[in-house]
């Protein structure tokens, strides 16, 4: 595996590779990330990964400097997965001058859910992903469903800019007890780690309530409120539990709900000092 930090060197290395499959990450890799590499291999060749901790997507209360950086361990993991090139630029490589141009997602998708609680986050994500796409010029890019809203935003960005890239969604990888794998899990205390699977069970409870009752009399806002209250009773601090349409992450109308519109339940909640997100499609 070749490790590259220069944008020009990356382009030179990939020249003529018109089937490249790309997996962007911020490093600190775990099994969930590695599953993305394996899926990428099924959809393209060669597999190209990136590791870049993107300052633009960190808010004022989010510590960019404390984000775990484990490059050597990450390199070993990617080598074992047969990744062809790792693009690991420095901040100077990616932003040699102030990044004055930004890619801002539409407000109806970028300012809800995660966007409401992390202002500017998706603007930072879209800007760096667009730049990474420009650097790697892949045919395929793989994004995990765990970051469901991010997946939707990147997919729409690719469509609206007519980028010749297929966005492939990857299923969330979970521990045996259901907790979604995340770099943030390392911050959980033993007691918090034992409690953490409750978040996924809450999503299942919401799904069972929605699917098990009479749709004509269902009150989705009340279902969401009860789920938030249940988490609060266990010591969580939920930002949201939201039942949304898969297609655009807007709340379904009663007519859409009764017609069987495909839905997804999304949640974000703090357990102690650690903020976890998860989702479940209905």
From Swiss-Prot:
InterPro entries, alphabetized: Cyt_trans-like (IPR004821), Pantoate_ligase (IPR003721), Pantoate_ligase_C (IPR042176), Rossmann-like_a/b/a_fold (IPR014729)
Q: What positions constitute the catalytic site? A: 33
List the record's Gene Ontology CC terms alphabetically. cytosol
Quote the CDD domains the UniProt record gives: PanC
UniProt record, GO biological process: pantothenate biosynthetic process
Q: What does this protein do?
A: Catalyzes the condensation of pantoate with beta-alanine in an ATP-dependent reaction via a pantoyl-adenylate intermediate.
Instruction: Identify its protein family.
Output: Belongs to the pantothenate synthetase family.
Additional remark text: The reaction proceeds by a bi uni uni bi ping pong mechanism.
Protein name, entry field: Pantothenate synthetase
What organism is this sequence from?
Cupriavidus taiwanensis (strain DSM 17343 / BCRC 17206 / CCUG 44338 / CIP 107171 / LMG 19424 / R1) (Ralstonia taiwanensis (strain LMG 19424))
């Amino acid at each position: 595996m070749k490790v590259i930090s220069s944008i020009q060197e990356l382009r030179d290395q990939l020249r003529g590779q018109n089937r490249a499959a790309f997996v962007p990450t911020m490093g600190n890799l775990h099994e969930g990330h590695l599953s993305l590499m394996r899926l990428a291999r099924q959809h393209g060749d060669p597999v190209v990964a990136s590791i870049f901790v993107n300052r633009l997507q960190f808010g004022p209360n989010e510590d960019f400097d404390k984000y775990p950086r484990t490059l050597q361990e990450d390199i070993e993991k990617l080598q074992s997965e047969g990744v062809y090139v790792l693009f690991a630029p420095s901040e100077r490589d990616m932003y040699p001058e102030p990044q004055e141009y930004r890619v801002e997602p539409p407000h109806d998708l970028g300012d809800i859910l995660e966007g409401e609680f992390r202002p500017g986050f998706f603007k930072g994500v879209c800007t760096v992903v667009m730049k990474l796409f420009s650097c790697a010029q892949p045919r395929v890019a793989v994004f995990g469903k765990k970051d469901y809203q991010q997946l939707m935003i990147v997919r729409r960005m690719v469509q609206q800019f007519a980028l010749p890239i297929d966005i492939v969604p990857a299923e969330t990888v979970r521990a045996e007890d259901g907790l979604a794998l995340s770099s943030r899990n390392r911050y959980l205390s033993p007691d918090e780690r034992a409690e953490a699977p409750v978040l996924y069970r809450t999503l299942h409870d919401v799904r069972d309530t929605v699917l098990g009752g009479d749709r004509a009399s269902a009150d989705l806002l009340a279902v969401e409120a009860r789920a938030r209250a249940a988490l609060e009773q266990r010591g969580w601090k939920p930002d949201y539990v939201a039942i949304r349409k898969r297609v655009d992450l807007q709340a379904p109308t009663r007519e859409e709900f009764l017609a069987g519109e495909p839905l997804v339940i999304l949640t974000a909640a703090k357990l102690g000092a650690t903020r976890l997100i998860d989702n479940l499609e209905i």
